[in-house]
Amino acid sequence: MTDAFDRLKKRSRTPIAREGSLTTGPELSDRPLQLLPREFETFCDRYAVHAGDVIEAALDLVLLDPDLQQRLLQRLRQGNGSDRVWLGTACPRSWQQQLQQQAQDQGLSEADLLQEAIAQRLDLVLGQTTLREEVTLLRQELDQLKRKLHGW
């Protein structure tokens, strides 16, 4: 299809936990991703996307949304195994303890340390291009295709 879409499809393929998931509202581009249980596979099937791509999109949203960071940290602290979810992958209690210890050692809040870890992950996955830029390119290319199809 389009170059930007192809780049999105070639990203890393991150395994996903069965419970603990990400989904959106009716308009894919208008609603932030939210952590919801047991709907991840349905979401991926409905929109024909790979779990890794959705997780990477969530990373960008977590960076932009302090409330989402806090909700994610709250889920990390919960004792229920299905709720110990970090960006769609199972998060062991030892990871939570490591996060708390690193935050203390570096004199940072857990949210700041988590944001830094997410930023580093984004750099690895996306190079220096943010997902926002990819989405902008996709929308521009989609608009061009619509104009061609409808003869605008």
From Swiss-Prot:
Its main location: other. Keywords: Bacterial microcompartment, Carbon dioxide fixation, Carboxysome. Disruption phenotype: Loss of McdA oscillation, carboxysomes (Cb) have much larger size variation and cluster, forming irregularly-shaped foci mostly near the poles, with smaller foci elsewhere (Cbs are usually regularly spaced along the central axis of the cell). Double mcdA-mcdB deletions have a similar phenotype (32 degrees Celsis, 80 umol photon m(-2) sec(-1) constant light, 2% CO(2)). At 20, 30 or 40 degrees Celsius (60 umol photon m(-2) sec(-1) constant light, 2% CO(2)) Cbs lose regular spacing and instead form large aggregates, increased level of RuBisCO at 20 and 30 degrees. GO terms for biological process: carbon fixation. It is found in: Carboxysome. One of its GO terms (cellular component) is carboxysome. Induction: Transcription is reproducibly circadian, under control of RpaA. It comes from the Bacteria. Disulfide bonds: none annotated. McdA and McdB together mediate carboxysome (Cb) spacing, size, ultrastructure and probably inheritance in the cell. Together they prevent Cb aggregation. McdA is an ATPase that forms dynamic gradients on the nucleoid in response to adapter protein McdB, which associates with carboxysomes. The interplay between McdA gradients on the nucleoid and McdB-bound carboxysomes result in the equal spacing of Cbs along the cell length. McdB may have an additional function in cell divison. Stimulates the ATPase activity of McdA, causing McdA to be released from DNA. A type 1 McdB protein. The N-terminus (approximately residues 1-18) is intrinsically disordered, and not necessary for hexamerization; its net positive charge modulates liquid-liquid phase separation (replacing Arg or Lys residues with polar Gln decreases phase separation). The central domain has a stable alpha-helical structure (approximately residues 19-121), dimerizes and drives phase separation. The C-terminal domain (approximately residues 122-152) probably has 2 alpha-helices and is responsible for hexamerization. Self-associates, interacts with McdA probably via the C-terminus of both proteins. Homohexamerizes. Probably a trimer of dimers. Interacts with most of the shell components of the carboxysome (CcmK2, CcmK3, CcmK4, CcmL and CcmO, but not CcmP) via its C-terminus. This is Maintenance of carboxysome distribution protein B.
